[in-house]
């Protein structure tokens, strides 16, 4: 356990940020799973735009790496393009 006040504060801040980041990543993962389960191309395209924005937002905030966001967007676009 930290002894200094600043270390205690840093620990509290890290826990708070970890919870926020985890919930944001979980929300995006849920949207991705929903997108992959869709069979209708129009619905999938609408959700794809939403997911792409979320991935860009996470990458901009440093929650996920920019390349990881780009790779996920690319794979999801291929998936939606393959739908009929």
Curated annotation (Swiss-Prot):
Xref: Gene3D superfamilies: Ribosomal protein S20
Transmembrane segments: none
GO biological process annotation, one example: translation
Pfam families for the chain: Ribosomal_S20p (PF01649)
Residue ranges, annotated region (Disordered): 1-32
InterPro entries found in the cross-reference section: Ribosomal_bS20 (IPR002583), Ribosomal_bS20_sf (IPR036510)
GO molecular function terms listed in the Swiss-Prot or TrEMBL record: small ribosomal subunit rRNA binding; structural constituent of ribosome
Record keywords: Ribonucleoprotein, Ribosomal protein, RNA-binding, rRNA-binding
Cellular component terms (Gene Ontology): cytosol; small ribosomal subunit
Role summary: Binds directly to 16S ribosomal RNA.
Record-stated family: Belongs to the bacterial ribosomal protein bS20 family.
Listed NCBIfam families: S20
The name this protein goes by in its record: Small ribosomal subunit protein bS20
Organism: Salinibacter ruber (strain DSM 13855 / M31)
